């Protein structure tokens, strides 16, 4: 299970410090460099998406209880009658099999009846349903990254979010557990205006564009970057400057073990992944590489009941690992880096357009651009 210390979330939201409390003293076998190294936190992308229908309460619970994720990532949309719901897509086709309908064209009374295409059938949750899950006893240390999609007017969406946060009590103030992910300056400005006490993470696929936000004029802001855009010298310089400015770095969406290991070596503070269980396993292997690995947690993540169920849990994990273990061949490595090369060509071509659009304010760059680039 994930850390249950309230400091897990509070440290992130107050100082935007994402790293786990496990410290590894690395030698040459630990990925390069010496000295103490903190493992990134496991952030479950739309919940435990690798195993369950995405953005459902089942996927969120499984991410925490089965995979041991430290945090959840999900997406915000607004129904026609003003209910804040959790869905990556603005339409209902892919996840719910409904053609030619958008979320903002439907009332909640209709949306709540839909079931996912993927088994086991689940219903679309609201933001208040997720907050209810986070308010359960023992989950005080879990935090959540809310990706604000750009299909809805930001003032209306964030106003509704503010109402939900104000009307849903929790054991820890929500501004110590919630981070808003924004794709562009207009949405950052709206969060700072409507929810000024909440931290923000810039979501971007371009390190050159994101560099514009490495300024004291953008306080309380971390970076949530497309991982494959950071491979290579441009990304390395960006990571260096992020750390030099004492900002935190999250990378998305990391599902290959090689890129998980790369993210640890690069010093990422959080890793967004469809498979948080696999990432936790990679982190455990990484701990084993360290010389004199030590753990300094304020509370233990294990319990006697958890120990009694360890054998059953391990069998379940082993079954899930079937078919996803990397083959370690040079062909796989070549394929991964060729894929990165192709993506970086697209990023290089479209970044100037992105920066011009942002500069002249024609339209704020958002997730649709990332979708167009197939990132």
What are these regions (language model features)?
Residues 1-375:
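Phosphate-group recognition and catalysis centered on beta-loop-alpha active-site segments
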